[in-house]
Amino acid sequence: AGDAMQPTSLLLSLRDAGFEMNDDLTKLYLDYCKERSTISMNSQDWTLPEPTRAAYTDDMLNTATAFSDTAVVVIGRSGGENADLPTDMNAVIHGTYDVAKTDVVDTKYKGNYGYTAGTYTNNGDYDDFEPGEHYLELSRTEEDLVDMVCSNFRNVIVVINANNAMELDWVDKYDNIGAVLLVPGTGTTGMTALGKILSGAVNPSGKTVDTYLKDLTKAPTYNHSGNSGNHIYTETDDLVKKVGRNDLSFQGVFTFTDYVEGIYMGYKFYETAAEEGLIDYNEYVQYPFGYGLSYTSFTQKITDFKQNDDSLTVEVTVKNTGDVEGKD
């Protein structure tokens, strides 16, 4: 736990690391969204505040590109306990998102949004998401932002500030995106590391703890997890009344998830399915479990292998083959 009300900001992290930033762009972002949308146990505003393409004038872009040929794009997502990520953002926008499927729930619960009601406010005069697009995809406004930045800056760094594994297939569409940094929940002081990493003072050594897919909707768990796979508890009338009296955000539905996949989730499914010829691994997986780059390179060599009944022991020698210190 930490004091989330006074965290180290991204701007402070960059300044402390010696970076200078474009004042016009900084002011644009700070003025556009002085207060962030809230996603909590009792309130779920899934809005992704982002200035539209029209907010970036020609003069602003000309000044920015003259200032530097390098740009940092930050994409953020939230979510957490009692805030399962929506699988149809367009429906959230229009207030019709119904996680209580009509074929598995009594009609008196139809239309309820899980435990709490969810909302979304568009950034422009268009819908940020098309029907069926989920929360871990880029919004239309974010797509416009990435395209604009990559069309104007030679070097682009993408920072993903999200605890959940987003769809990042769009990264491969732009040759000038030279780096993607995964920066999940930073707590009070975690963001201080970002500036140090970007400046080269610190060599990153983190690895992905999830499998990053090119299309999350093709994951076996997609239709059985979170709001998309909710089953509804029955015989809960007494509990519904008690909770409803104490929690005004309660919508009258208690849900659960059926873990039908067993152990075959994440890398266990994709590596097994590829080995058995069910899928082409590279068509599904963008970044595998345990993936991560640094400012140096390594080689690994198995130097010993032992099997003892039902246990295996493998010894690996790791060698830094690059020019700077690092960890692997």
Describe every region a protein language model picked out.
Residues A1-D328:
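C-terminal non-catalytic regions of proteins with extracellular/luminal or membrane-system context
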